[in-house]
Each structure stands twice: as structure tokens, then as C-alpha cells.
Design a protein with these regions (language model features):
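Extended, histidine- and acidic-residue-enriched regions that form the cofactor-binding/catalytic faces
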Residues: 14-103, 107-125, 129-258
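N-terminal signal peptide c-region/cleavage motif recognized by signal peptidases
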Residues: 9-11
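Cleavable N-terminal signal peptides
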Residues: 2-4, 14
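Alpha-helical interaction segments
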Residues: 4-6, 215
């Protein structure tokens, strides 16, 4: 059964949908679409990770869910349930932040892909919304590729880089900053409180954010790293569209990989 036809029958979405949600299927339906030609997309976004005083802990999860919907509408893929925990050691000083050990974050994706590959699929794509997550994803790719399972992931630093450079006005930043806040103003403005947005940028050669100016790392009392006060919806739209096009190209490139 074709993915597109099963997507319509299984979920009855209000919009044209090319892909399907694995969670909406029975195992009998899943067996029909989990074939060697299938690309399985696994969204990844933290649902409990600090993003300054103006963005929610669920920020990355909301972002992952947004891109998941866009991919479902545009790509012939099977989308697995969103993974909402991973490797975020840079933010552990801020309450509400959760992180997995590197090995756990790596092995979670290895295990998910191995389990689904038993039934046919050999190509998997992590729809990644984090920076520190790329390390365990790269390690997972090494393990899986050695087993003949192709695994790709979004390099979030590169995906929207050109668009970011074109619109960004901040001195620097990478977290809960001008760009990330702009993205959220575009995809989920209700989750942003611009009255609490701040500029908090203290570069450091040491990785990770810290609430203590005497500790190694980039000092940030707010948990932000950059200038969120410069964020606009229009900037967010430009970056989101650039990231989406990169993700779609990544998926099609993976589909063509032997």
C-alpha cells in the first residue's frame, strides 16, 4: 500500500499529507509501509530544557513538532514518535533542564533504528533541533552505518546558516537568542514572552552556560546566550523556511543513498 493512500485512510488529516505517522497505525498497517525503500524520520526535541526567561522549557519539542508537520505534508516518509530527551550538558545549572548521558542518547537512536530495521527500513533520519545532540547522533550514525543501516540527521548549525547571517543583528549567540526567539515568534508566538526577553552574551572559550560568573563557561544569569530583544517574526520565517528546505533535501539525499 502506498504511503500517501495509507496516510489519508489512517489519519484523515485536514490537509494534503504525503507522509504518515507511525503511531497512528496498527502493526498490520505498519508492516505494509516499513519496507526497505522507506525513509523513517525520527523527530528530536527537548521537552524539558531551559531557554531563558522568555521561552518555555518545551521549546525544542515545539520546534520538532512543527518541522514534523511540515515534513509530513511534503515528504513520502514514515514519521516515528518524537524523542523528547537527549544530551544537553550545557544547561544543567538551570532548573527544569534534563540531560541524558552521552552513551544513553547515542544508544537510544541506535536501538530505535535497529528495532524498526528488523521489519525492512534501512534509512533513518533524525529531525534534530539541537546543537549538543549532534555529537551522540554522529556516534549513532557510525554504529548504524557499520551495520548497513543508513542514518542521517539535521545539522542545525548549518541548515539555516545563510538565512541567519542575512537577518541577524546580534553581536553573537546560539541559545534563546535573536534567531531562536525569532523562530518561535514565527511557529508558536503564544509561547514567547518578549517582555522578558534579554540580551545576555558573555563569550567564553569554555563550553556550557553557567549561572556563576566565577565558574568556567559562558556566564549567563538568564540562561540565554545572545540578544533575544532583536527577535522578529519575519526573521524567524526566513530561517525556518531555510531549515525546512535543508531538511527536505537531506531526506531525499538519504533516500537515494545505496
Amino acid at each position: 500500500m502506498a504511503l500517501a493512500s495509507l496516510a489519508v485512510s489512517a489519519a484523515a488529516p485536514a490537509f494534503a499529507q504525503k507522509g504518515i505517522l507511525l503511531e497512528d497505525l496498527t502493526w498490520i498497517e505498519a508492516e505494509k509501509v516499513l519496507t526497505p525503500d522507506t525513509v523513517v524520520v525520527i523527530p528530536l526535541g527537548a521537552e524539558s530544557k531551559e531557554h531563558g526567561p522568555h521561552l518555555k522549557l518545551k521549546n525544542d519539542f515545539v520546534m520538532a513538532e512543527y518541522f514534523k508537520r511540515q515534513v509530513l505534508a511534503r515528504a513520502n516518509v514514515v514519521v516515528a514518535p518524537t524523542v523528547n530527551y537527549s544530551f544537553y550538558p550545557a544547561f544543567v545549572e538551570y532548573p527544569g533542564t534534563t540531560t541524558l548521558r552521552f552513551e544513553t542518547a547515542r544508544d537510544m537512536f541506535v536501538d530505535i533504528c535497529r528495532a524498526l530495521s528488523r521489519h525492512g527500513p534501512r534509512r533513518f533520519y533524525a529531525l534534530n533541533t539541537g546543537v549538543s545532540t549532534m555529537r551522540p547522533l554522529e556516534a549513532a550514525a557510525t554504529v548504524l552505518n557499520a551495520e548497513g543501516i543508513r542514518f542521517g540527521y539535521t545539522n542545525i548549525l548549518e541548515a539555516g546558516a545563510a538565512a541567519e547571517k542575512a537577518v541577524s543583528k546580534q553581536e553573537g549567540g546560539t541559545h534563546a537568542d535573536e534567531i531562536e526567539t525569532s523562530i518561535m515568534l514565527y511557529i508558536d508566538p503564544a509561547s514567547v514572552d518578549m517582555s522578558k526577553a534579554v540580551k545576555d552574551y558573555h563569550p567564553s572559550e569554555k563550553s556550557g552556560l553557567t549561572r556563576d560568573p566565577k565558574k568556567p563557561g559562558a556566564y549567563s544569569a538568564s540562561g540565554a546566550y545572545g540578544d533575544a530583544t532583536l527577535a522578529t517574526r519575519e526573521k524567524g520565517e526566513a530561517v525556518v523556511q531555510a531549515i525546512l528546505q535543508t531538511v527536505l533535501k537531506d531526506i531525499e539525499k538519504l533516500r537515494q543513498t545505496p
